Amino acid sequence: VGQEFYGEYLAKTDPLGADVPNPVSHVAYGYATQMCVLDKKTGRIKKLVAAHDVGKAVNPLSCEGQIEGGVVMSMGYALTEQYPIDDTCKPTAKYGTLGLFRANQIPPEIQAIVVEKPGLNVAGGAIGIGEITSIPTAPAIADAYYRLDGQRRLTLPLENTPYAKKK
């Protein structure tokens, strides 16, 4: 809290419609950070803040929706989803038993912060807001639980949380 960090990475892309062999039309990088706030009494997530660098937000509302959707999807990965496989990597569970995150488990607040850096010399100034939305969630949640109870959780789904499947 109260700290600020700055980083920058610029990649060269060819202009849209450029007549060059093997044009570079887009870049695949991004910067994202997330913070999880737990209810100290229940251990459930009260709020998750997600800030994502998108370059130019061509459609800001859609960017926010992409962030929120990625956060919810990866909350399931972090907290409830089990995907058991056998030695041949064949799934051994039925879809309904995988522990997908449910609508009633979504925290009261997901704050999506779209960070723009206009003027980038890339395709339309946008650098993308896809898979990156789901990457920082599990570490943010694991760190919140560590700060709550001092216990490091190093496997997913995280154990000893109110969301964990009872054994």
Where are these regions (language model features)?
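C-terminal catalytic domains of large/alpha subunits in multi-subunit enzymes
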Residues: 1-167
